[in-house]
Amino acid sequence: PFTTSVADSMIIGLHIEDNVYGPLYFDYLADLDPDDPIMAPRNLFETWINQFAPETVLVLVKASPDAIRNRMAERPHKAGVVQRGDIELVLRRFEEEFQRSALPNKLVIDTTDATVEESVAEFTRRIGPFLTDRDRDRMDSIDADSG
């Protein structure tokens, strides 16, 4: 969000991931209320995003606990953070942070029964209402150049 008006950005995690994983796995932010004064700098992220990049869309990508367990078993990450016993808690915490967020543009993609390709296609279909006129003009220009 802190880029020029010409660039596009994708930020994954940022303060929300910190708020979820920090207390659970990295021994920081534990036992702090979201309104605790020490959280003020983290809470400012959304103020800055709303001020400097109001077109930002917060996307919650989720799946059922069983789907996540199956994916963890089938394709384990070498440096995976989430522990099997914490899946429900992590899902709940991401949902809470998503609902609590002051970012007005929000989208939920449930990948429980979808492939990666299907999830990307769903995102592509559903992001439309959040695109600016400038975004659409740029996309039309790219389509014209490639066609």
Question: Model-derived features: where do they sit?
Answer:
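Short alpha-helical segments and helix-capping/turn motifs at coil-helix boundaries
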Residues: P1, N43-F45
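Conserved substrate/cofactor phosphate-moiety recognition/catalytic segment
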Residues: P1-M10, I16-L24
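Conserved catalytic network of the ASCE P-loop NTPase/AAA+ motor domain
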Residues: F2-S5, N50-P54, S101
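Conserved beta-strand scaffold positions in the cores of enzyme catalytic domains, especially
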Residues: D8-M10, T56-L60, K106-I109
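Alpha-helix initiation/capping motif
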Residues: G13-L14, Q83
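Conserved nucleotide-binding/hydrolysis micro-motifs of P-loop NTPases
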Residues: H15-E17, A63-R69, D113-T115
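A glycine- and Lys/Arg-enriched "phosphate-lid" helix/loop adjacent to the NTP-binding pocket
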Residues: Y21, Y25-P41, W48-E97
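NTP-dependent small-molecule kinase module
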Residues: E74-K78, G85-G147
